[in-house]
UniProtKB/Swiss-Prot annotation:
Protein name: Translation initiation factor 5A
Listed SMART domains: eIF-5a
Gene name for this UniProt entry: eif5a
Organism: Methanococcus maripaludis (strain DSM 14266 / JCM 13030 / NBRC 101832 / S2 / LL)
A GO MF label: translation initiation factor activity
Predominant location category: cytoplasm
Length: 131
């Protein structure tokens, strides 16, 4: 499952995902402001990239549309550790994937079960499920 779907900018909340400048990001902060008597509300989003540590901001009318990535959360088993990469097998489809070793997830070793997600044709290991 890859791609995006449109969503209203004013409906986004902290913790949801959004695409800013072609980069899938997690919303860290939102600020709504109404400029005055004549004018629509504006929304300022601050977001952090999912796959790369980059901070993004977006400002627009609350009624405007913005792309939201379709995220597929899956489970896999670590088959091998290969330096800066991890080879995992999907537990539903049994396909093998080679993903970059995450720096923010502890306890990755051969044989452990992990949760990973796919968004916009990219993959990331998010947590260790069982050791």
């Amino acid at each position: 499952m890859a791609g995006t779907k449109p969503s209203e900018l004013g409906a986004l909340k902290v913790g949801q995902y959004v695409v800013i400048d072609g980069i899938a990001c997690r919303v860290m902060d939102t600020a709504h402001s109404k400029p005055g008597k004549h004018g629509g509300a504006k929304v300022r989003l601050t977001a952090m990239g999912i796959f790369e540590p980059v901070k993004k901001e977006h400002v627009g009318p609350a009624s405007s549309r913005i792309d939201v990535p379709l995220i597929d959360k899956r489970k896999g088993q670590v088959l091998a550790l290969m330096g800066e990469h991890v080879q995992i097998m999907d537990l539903e489809t049994y396909e093998t994937l080679e993903l970059p070793m995450p720096t923010d997830v502890e306890g990755i070793d051969s044989g452990v079960e992990v949760e990973y997600f796919e968004a916009m044709d990219r993959y990331k290991i998010t947590r260790v499920i069982s050791k």
